[in-house]
Design a protein with these regions (language model features):
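Terminal amphipathic alpha-helical/low-complexity segments used for targeting or macromolecular assembly
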Residues: 1-46, 50-55, 59-61, 74, ...
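Flexible, glycine/small-residue-enriched loop-and-beta-strand segment within the central core
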Residues: 48-49, 53-176, 205, 211-213
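Short, well-ordered amphipathic alpha-helices
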Residues: 109, 184-185
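Solvent-exposed alpha-helix faces
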Residues: 129, 187-188
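Nucleotide-sugar donor-binding loop of glycosyltransferases
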Residues: 140, 193-194
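Short secondary-structure boundary/capping segments
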Residues: 150, 190-191
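Short beta-to-alpha loop/turn elements within the nucleotide-binding domains of ABC transporters
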Residues: 176-177, 188, 194
Length: 220
């Protein structure tokens, strides 16, 4: 019997065990009250929470390994759906009300940085595949002003649909929308909203390179 099968067969016992591990002070720093971590499996992860009333919720069968989860704010949430895998993920929320949502059966492999600020949301749908050295950001972290002193670079949500395959070294910036059944080619920089499904996006800035496609995790 594999470790994962054993864990799945005894969810209450193993869930309690990982709850204890994830709250050990030498592993993690969870300050103030009202913060909750529940579900899933986290191994060799580091958690830093400095606000109040934050939630980290992992679905059944989900496994995070060698990840870093940071929340610097209050009323923030990280939701990972069932049967998903994240390895070497850096999930970062700053300011109040931010949300990072990853769907069911989505795999994130290799160093990936999800940065959420100013109460915005990063959402990744079901059955997705994310390669290494991927960056997703909802904002610029610093202000750009016009000559009247008004800020012109507000943060915006990022939406990634179901069944999206993101290649290596892709950057996805504020306001981007990637619809379902899309492949994002290696090195692409996505800066705007796309609505057409079944395409390959590539280039800087990203544009539609191919149409009427679908993809499969298996080498058929």
């Amino acid at each position: 019997m594999s470790i994962r099968t054993l864990i799945s067969s005894r969810p209450k016992l193993t869930g309690f065990g990982f709850w204890v591990i994830n709250h050990l002070p030498f592993n993690n720093s969870i300050r103030k009250k009202g913060n909750k971590i529940s579900g899933g499996i986290m191994t060799r992860c580091r958690i830093r929470i400095s606000g109040k009333n934050n939630r980290i919720v992992l679905g059944q069968g989900t496994w995070l390994k060698h990840c870093k989860l940071t929340i610097k704010g209050s009323n923030c949430s990280i939701f990972i759906g069932a049967d998903s895998v994240i390895r070497q993920g850096d999930l970062y929320i700053e300011d109040d009300g931010g949300r990072i949502v990853v769907g069911n059966r989505t795999a994130i492999y290799g160093p990936t940085h999800l940065a959420c600020i100013e109460g915005k949301t990063i959402s990744i749908g079901d059955d997705g595949l994310v390669s290494g050295n991927v960056t997703v950001r909802v904002g610029d972290s610093h202000s750009i002003l016009n000559l009247e002193g008004n800020r012109i670079n507000p943060s915006q949500d990022v939406q990634i649909g179901n069944r999206v395959w993101i290649g290596n070294q892709v950057t996805i910036l504020k306001g981007a929308r990637i619809p379902e059944d899309t492949v994002v080619a290696t090195g692409a920089i996505v800066t705007k909203q796309f609505s057409q499904t079944g395409t390959v996006l590539g280039g800087n800035p990203a544009k539609i390179m191919k149409e009427n496609i679908r993809w499969d995790k298996k080498r058929l």
